[in-house]
Amino acid sequence: SSFAKQIAMIEAGLQKPVLKVGNLDSLRTWSDVRDAVNAYYMLVTIDPIPGEYYNIGGSFSCSVRDMLDHLLSLSKVQGIKIEVETERLRPIDADLQVPDTTKFKNHTGWKPEIGFEKTMQDLLDYWRQRINSNKNFLSR
């Protein structure tokens, strides 16, 4: 969300065309929050089993760099520079972790519905709308 927010602020002229980033080589498994909320809803409404545990998450994995490249390809501004800030680097970064959602899928029939590309487009559009609806938007 930080990258999408920064891109939207650059597009609105509220930030110089420099994107502040951390480690772009980390691998992440991505899931749309709308899919996660749907999973949580199903968890409590479809035959919940007290004390049972489930993994919920996405199955699409890529590097943070690939995710950023995708967001930049959606930007209305070309030539945005990337600047690594040491305070954004984690002292220890986990290797790729992909949740095994088999048990939850078998119990509920749930599966992620919203693809990575749509998630990234919607995320950038959200920040564009939020920033453009209030030019006095405070960067936090």
Question: Language model features by range: what are they?
Answer:
Residues V18-L19, E52-Y54, C62-D69, V77-L96, ...:
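C-terminal "lid/loop" region of Rossmann-like NAD(P)-dependent oxidoreductases
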Residues V44-T45, S75, W127:
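Protein kinase-like catalytic domain
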Residues S1-K5, A12-P17, V33-R34, M42-Y54, ...:
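Glycine/proline-rich active-site loop of Rossmann-fold NAD(P)-dependent oxidoreductases
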Residues F116-R140:
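Amphipathic terminal alpha-helices
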Residues S1, G22-V37, E52-S73, L89-I92, ...:
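Substrate-binding strand-loop-helix patch
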